[in-house]
Amino acid sequence: MAHANHFDVIVIGSGPGGEGAAMGLTKAGLKVAVVEKESSVGGGCTHWGTIPSKALRHAVSRIIEFNSNPLFCKNNSSLHATFSTILGHAKSVIDKQTRLRQGFYDRNQCQLIFGTARFTDAHTISVTQNDGTEEVYTADKFVIATGSRPYQPADVDFNHERIYDSDSILSLKHDPRHIIIYGAGVIGCEYASIFRGLGVKTDLINTRDRLLAFLDNEVSDALSYHFWNSGVVIRNDETYERIEGTEDGVIVHLQSGKKMKADCLLYANGRTGNTDKLNLPAVGLQGDSRGQLKVDGNYQTEVEHVYAVGDVIGYPSLASAAYDQGRFVAQAITKGKADGYLIDDIPTGIYTIPEISSVGKTEQELTAAKVPYEVGRSSFKHLARAQIAGKDIGSLKILFHRETKEILGIHCFGERAAEIIHIGQAIMEQKGEANTIEYFVNTTFNYPTMAEAYRVAALNGLNRLF
């Protein structure tokens, strides 16, 4: 029995990081088990984060597209939906993703163990199953890929039926007419787009002086303007003093003296690593104040046989990066060293309505570094494909070195921005002289396409040189 419960590697968590590690390890011939605390695989990415929020966004954007299409407006037709009704679309996508990922484990003969894991000593974990029974498993090595969860400050009553975090909002049963979103990071801005797109009065409380300050200033300003134009009320530089749940809603008392009232509140201000229930001291580890673990270049923790990947190690906290980290940790375990590493310029995709995506440096970063750069711009309203699709809001901006023509940064705001960015990323990742803005002038694009924005922006930028 003890032999059957011993593995070469046990991976704790079946999100993107855990999946990447497990697949790499099983394909290398190791005996691997994956422990998942929920009843199905996929982790927070599949069940509460990336997949459901993007499915919701897609449904809302299609409703907006229908209602703004002149073909339907002429017939006085209008399509309406509530948050609770479009949740059905998100759940169908979650089910498909879960079945797909379950198949990966089945085909690769990777054992799945459902339950909550905690360390009991350096090489042993105890897994508590849903029925309360416990089973003990041992392994030579461990990979912690437990992800993160929404941060919940102690002075906010998340048990109140009208106060939600970004996980529990997916269980919203009523249909609010007015919502306050506290926290204007990526998650807060994405949900602001979703609720406003459904016609819900939306107030967005930002604890900083501008939205998504890590973005290029022009893109951040474009998002702020688009929110303002669509009716989202943004309160910058505000912090709550207390959040009061009432019988019919929520009142937010701000430190500035203002008060805000709505049917419900979505608290979306920060996340914390899921390490508190692992009993890390038993294996010689300790998470930091945010529940995160420190790792080296091989994703090895301070304990030699324990590795960690994904949100639980902090930046960049992206599903795409977590999967790559999982692959790299599998290489580190099987070969002693990871063959690859995360690229320096990881693209950012923000699924607001419209989308935002960027890769490389911002204008403010290049200006601070005194880099002689130039800017090439393309407005979507001038692209035939955007006009045909009725998606003419947005632009593409290319930042490049005035002397070498090297592409330094790309920033996109508009329909399919998260897809469009990868064209430029592919050229940016080329070595030496192959990374040049002139590529977009000298190549031939399909017409009409959104990708043609690169040619327009490149010509615009090169024409600025003298």
From Swiss-Prot:
NCBIfam families: PRK05249.1. It holds the Pfam family Pyr_redox_2. Its cofactor is FAD. It catalyses: NAD(+) + NADPH = NADH + NADP(+). FAD binds at E36, K37, E38, S39, S40, V41, G42, G43, G44, C45. One of its GO terms (cellular component) is cytosol. This is Soluble pyridine nucleotide transhydrogenase. Conversion of NADPH, generated by peripheral catabolic pathways, to NADH, which can enter the respiratory chain for energy generation. GO terms for biological process: 2-oxoglutarate metabolic process; NADP metabolic process. It is found in: Cytoplasm. Belongs to the class-I pyridine nucleotide-disulfide oxidoreductase family. It comes from the Bacteria. GO terms for molecular function: dihydrolipoyl dehydrogenase (NADH) activity; flavin adenine dinucleotide binding; NAD(P)+ transhydrogenase (Si-specific) activity. The lineage of its organism: Bacteria, Pseudomonadati, Pseudomonadota, Gammaproteobacteria, Vibrionales. Gene3D superfamilies: 3.30.390.30, FAD/NAD(P)-binding domain (3.50.50.60). Binds 1 FAD per subunit. Its EC number is 1.6.1.1. The keyword Cytoplasm applies. The keyword Repeat does not apply. Keywords: Cytoplasm, FAD, Flavoprotein, NAD, NADP, Oxidoreductase.
